């Protein structure tokens, strides 16, 4: 699929231009984080083969790991059955979480 065909498959309207994106370790299957993408961040992710997200708090694009060096190299991108959520499998360099943990899901509630 080319970029335009990929973008047609995704329903950005439901989330007011944003879609939740689950980041999973390609090798272990561990869920590393959840972030949000808009069309531009998805385009940049596909173009650069590293993850780009939309920061809802800063209202800007950010390239995961650009500052810390903890980059995420894209191995595959999947879409859910409703076309409104992405799953991106990555090769994670260093920790995925800004706290220094491998995954953002390090706190157990139950």
Swiss-Prot record:
Its EC number is 3.5.4.19. It catalyses: 1-(5-phospho-beta-D-ribosyl)-5'-AMP + H2O = 1-(5-phospho-beta-D-ribosyl)-5-[(5-phospho-beta-D-ribosylamino)methylideneamino]imidazole-4-carboxamide. It comes from the Bacteria. Binds 1 Mg(2+) ion per subunit. Binds 1 zinc ion per subunit. Its main location: cytoplasm. One of its GO terms (molecular function) is magnesium ion binding. Zn(2+) binds at residues 81, 97, 104. GO terms for biological process: L-histidine biosynthetic process. It is an enzyme of class 3 (hydrolase). GO terms for cellular component: cytoplasm. Its cofactor is Mg(2+); Zn(2+). Pfam families: PRA-CH. Pathway: Amino-acid biosynthesis; L-histidine biosynthesis; L-histidine from 5-phospho-alpha-D-ribose 1-diphosphate: step 3/9. Keywords: Amino-acid biosynthesis, Cytoplasm, Histidine biosynthesis, Hydrolase, Magnesium, Metal-binding, Zinc. It is found in: Cytoplasm. Mg(2+) binds at residues 80, 82, 84. Belongs to the PRA-CH family. Homodimer. NCBIfam families: PRK00051.1. Catalyzes the hydrolysis of the adenine ring of phosphoribosyl-AMP. This is Phosphoribosyl-AMP cyclohydrolase. It comes from Clostridium botulinum (strain 657 / Type Ba4). The gene is hisI.
């Amino acid at each position: 699929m080319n970029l335009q065909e990929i973008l047609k498959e995704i329903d950005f309207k439901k989330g007011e231009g944003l879609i939740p994106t689950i980041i999973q370790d390609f090798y272990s299957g561990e869920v590393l984080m959840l972030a949000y993408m808009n069309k531009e961040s998805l385009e940049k992710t596909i173009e650069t083969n590293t993850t780009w997200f939309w920061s809802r708090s800063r209202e800007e694009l950010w390239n995961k790991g650009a500052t810390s060096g903890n980059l995420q190299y894209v191995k595959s991108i999947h879409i859910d059955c409703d076309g409104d959520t992405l799953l991106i499998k990555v090769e994670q360099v260093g920790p995925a979480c800004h706290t220094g943990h491998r995954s953002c899901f390090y706190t157990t509630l139950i």
